[in-house]
C-alpha cells in the first residue's frame, strides 16, 4: 500500500481576506447514485442528459449516502444513526465506499444547520431526495419533528420541473424544512434544519447533447490519448471548462461565508453533484495541477467526500481518500 498524501487547502478565505467563525465545519461533496446511463450507455442517445433518472440501485445508494452524511455530522444520537443504517444498508462489506483518513471531529459542537447545493440534473435531485428522506426520518425519531407529506422536497413535480414550495421565506429555487413545513412535533434535542438551493454551475460536464454509443467509444479513445483534463467533447465541454464553472461557484461560496459573519454560519455545506465536477472542485480548492487531477479516477456512485476545517492551521483538510489509477492504490475504490 502506498502512502496517501494529505490534501490541505492553501487559503480558505479566497480573495476576500481572512475571516473567522463564518466558515462551515464541513464541506461535503456527494456524487449521485447509479443512473440509467451508468447502467446502459445507450440511453444517452435518446434521453437528454439532464433528464436521466436513478436506477433502483441508485435510489438505494442515495439513501445510503444520507446515512454516510449523518455518520460524519455531530448529531445528538449516533446510535440512532446506526439503527437507521441497519435499515438502509443490508451489507456494509458489499458497498463501494471511500475511506476516511484522520477524521476525528476537530469540533464537537452540534451540527444543526446545513445548506445543500444540488445540480439541477434529475439524477442529482433524486439523490438529494433520498438523502433528505433519511434526514427527515432521523429528525422525526430524534426530536419528534415531522415534515408534512405534501411539503416534502420533490425532485420532479410537474413534468420536468422540481417542486419548490413557496412559503414566506422561500423563493424560486430554494427549499427549507423550516417551521412553514413542519406538521407536528417540536424540536426536543438537535433538529437538523436544512436549506436546498438549485445550482446550475455544479452540473455534469457537457458531453455534447445526444450521444450515440459507437461514436462516443471513439471519442473516449481520443480523450485517453489527448488527456482527460484538456480534451473537449464535440459540442460539449472539457474538464478545463468545468474548472471555470468551479472557480465561479467557489467565489460565490467565499462571499457567502464572508456575508454570514454577522449571522450564524452554516455548520455544513453539501454539494450533490457529479463525479467529474467533484474532482475538479477538489482540484481548484486544493490547487492541484492538471497532472494530479488526471491521476485520480472516478469515485463510485453515491460516494461522500469530506473536507474538514482545521482552525489550528486555518485550512480545510480533505479527509476522504480518493481512488487513483495506480495499482498500489487500486484497493481504495472498494
Curated annotation (Swiss-Prot):
Enzyme nomenclature, EC number: 3.1.3.-
Sample GO molecular function, one term: phosphatase activity
Disulfide bond residue pairs: none
GO biological process: intracellular sterol transport
Active-site residues, record numbering mapped to chain: 32, 126
Keyword Chaperone: no
CDD domains in the record: HP_PGM_like
Signal peptide: none
Family: Belongs to the phosphoglycerate mutase family.
Name recorded for this polypeptide: Broad-range acid phosphatase DET1
The organism of origin for this protein: Saccharomyces cerevisiae (strain ATCC 204508 / S288c) (Baker's yeast)
Gene of this entry: DET1
Amino acid at each position: 500500500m502506498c502512502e496517501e498524501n494529505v490534501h490541505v487547502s492553501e487559503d480558505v478565505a479566497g480573495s476576500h481576506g481572512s475571516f473567522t467563525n463564518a466558515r462551515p465545519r464541513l464541506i461535503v461533496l456527494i456524487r449521485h447514485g447509479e443512473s440509467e446511463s451508468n447502467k446502459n450507455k445507450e440511453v444517452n442517445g435518446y434521453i437528454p442528459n439532464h433528464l436521466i433518472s436513478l436506477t433502483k440501485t441508485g435510489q438505494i445508494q442515495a439513501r445510503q449516502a444520507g446515512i454516510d452524511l449523518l455518520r460524519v455530522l455531530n448529531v445528538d444520537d449516533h446510535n440512532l444513526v446506526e439503527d437507521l443504517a441497519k435499515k438502509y444498508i443490508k451489507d456494509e462489506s458489499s458497498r463501494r465506499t471511500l475511506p476516511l483518513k484522520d477524521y476525528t471531529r476537530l469540533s464537537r459542537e452540534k451540527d444543526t444547520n446545513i445548506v445543500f447545493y444540488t445540480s439541477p440534473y434529475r439524477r442529482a435531485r433524486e439523490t438529494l431526495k433520498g438523502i433528505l428522506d433519511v434526514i427527515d426520518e432521523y429528525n422525526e425519531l430524534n426530536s419528534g419533528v415531522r415534515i408534512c407529506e405534501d411539503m416534502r422536497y420533490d425532485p420532479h413535480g410537474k413534468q420536468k420541473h422540481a417542486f419548490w414550495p413557496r412559503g414566506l421565506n422561500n423563493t424560486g429555487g430554494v427549499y427549507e424544512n423550516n417551521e412553514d413545513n413542519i406538521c407536528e412535533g417540536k424540536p426536543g434535542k438537535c433538529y437538523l434544519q436544512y436549506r436546498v438551493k438549485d445550482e446550475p454551475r455544479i452540473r455534469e460536464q457537457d458531453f455534447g447533447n445526444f450521444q450515440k454509443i459507437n461514436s462516443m467509444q471513439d471519442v473516449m479513445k481520443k480523450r485517453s490519448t489527448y488527456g482527460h483534463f484538456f480534451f473537449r467533447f464535440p459540442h460539449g465541454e472539457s474538464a478545463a471548462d468545468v474548472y471555470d464553472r468551479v472557480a465561479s461557484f467557489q467565489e460565490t461560496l467565499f462571499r457567502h461565508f464572508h456575508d454570514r459573519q454577522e449571522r450564524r454560519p452554516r455548520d455544513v455545506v453539501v454539494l450533490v453533484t457529479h463525479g467529474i465536477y467533484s474532482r475538479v472542485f477538489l482540484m481548484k480548492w486544493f490547487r492541484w495541477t492538471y497532472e494530479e487531477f488526471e491521476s485520480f479516477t472516478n469515485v463510485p456512485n453515491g460516494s461522500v467526500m469530506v473536507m474538514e476545517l482545521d482552525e489550528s492551521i486555518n485550512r480545510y483538510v480533505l479527509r476522504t481518500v480518493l481512488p487513483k489509477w495506480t495499482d498500489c492504490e487500486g484497493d481504495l475504490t472498494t
